[in-house]
Amino acid sequence: MEEELMSLIKVWVYAIISISYCYYTSTRIKSGVFRLLSVLPVCVLFLVLPLFVSSVHFSGSTAFFLSWLANFKLILFSFDQGPLFPVPSNLSRFVCFTCFPIKLQQNPKPQNQMPKWGFAVKLAFFGVLLHMYEYKQHMSPTVLLVLYSLHIYLEYEILLAPLKVLLSISLWCDLEPHFNEPYLSTSLQDFWGRRWNLMVPAILRPAVYLPVRQMAGRKMNSDQALFLGVFASFLVSGVVHELIFFYFTRESPTGEVTLFFVLHGVCTAAECAAKRTRLVRRWKVSQMVSRLLTVGFVVMTGGWLFFPHLARSGMIERLADEAFLFIGFVKHKFFYLCRNQSLKS
């Protein structure tokens, strides 16, 4: 564990040095092709850095933070767009807004979130889920699918929520939440656009959706341009997920996760088009039914296309094993420090 932590520290030292170069050099170059050329070496480096750590958590988070989000942010920054425009006021802010999945909250709203103990409940529930892997061989495929889905969601939220709080305090600013109770989604558009991993649509919208829709709008009607913009966003998301799965498994991509996002892109675009018709506007469905249909569709298609590659490669079990290992590592260090403190006193 300690050797892997040292590798992670080295990776992030390289990342911070590279982003510092962008802050001091690329910001002085006029936006456009030349600024893009100045950040491209950093983007290439960010594609390589996750390969220097072997832990599933470390390689996955580094790939998500740097290879995906940071690269997209730097490309958008090259054209004075995205979260890095206007340029943050100092280096530390520039590094944080580039490296981490955070976005400044433009119009802070009154807090309407679950109580503070909600995070503790999710943390405790996640601990129960980890122990359920000991009985995996006795579970039906349906129960396993629910277990995998809850594991991915809770692990994401448990890792990202404290990071948001820490950075919000450090930077003295309000930051957008990463999740908005996705299990309450009433449609695919609601799930992907307003509730699940919100930093991703915040990046894909200016980077993919708007440019594609604008270009398509010159030769297509508005509905067709919208469909193409949504489809392109999901296609790009699928390709990037294939890359992240490669960092996870170090195996050749299978295309399954890309098909998962292509399917959801088509269904989300069709849903958006259907909502504009009179029939659907008049057809009222209860929120409970909408939530069951939406979450059920996401989970079932995930079991068909998203999870199989991870399950075959044993990555989900490795995530659980590493979580147990990390908890044990923290306990060991905690008791070691307490013992040393008692000996000194």
UniProtKB/Swiss-Prot annotation:
It is found in: Membrane. InterPro entries: Wax_synthase, Wax_synthase_dom, Wax_synthase_Magnoliopsida. The lineage of its organism: Eukaryota, Viridiplantae, Streptophyta, Embryophyta, Tracheophyta. It catalyses: a long chain fatty alcohol + a fatty acyl-CoA = a wax ester + CoA. It comes from the Eukaryota. GO terms for cellular component: membrane. Pfam families: MBOAT_2. This is Probable long-chain-alcohol O-fatty-acyltransferase 4. Keywords: Acyltransferase, Lipid biosynthesis, Lipid metabolism, Membrane, Transferase, Transmembrane, Transmembrane helix. The chain crosses the membrane at residues 5-25, 36-56, 114-134, 143-163, 226-246, 254-274, 288-308. Catalyzes the final step in the synthesis of long-chain linear esters (waxes). Belongs to the wax synthase family. It is a multi-pass membrane protein. Disulfide bonds: none annotated. PANTHER family: LONG-CHAIN-ALCOHOL O-FATTY-ACYLTRANSFERASE 10-RELATED (PTHR31595:SF41), LONG-CHAIN-ALCOHOL O-FATTY-ACYLTRANSFERASE 3-RELATED (PTHR31595). The gene is AT4. GO terms for biological process: lipid metabolic process. Coiled coil: none annotated. GO terms for molecular function: long-chain-alcohol O-fatty-acyltransferase activity. Its EC number is 2.3.1.75.
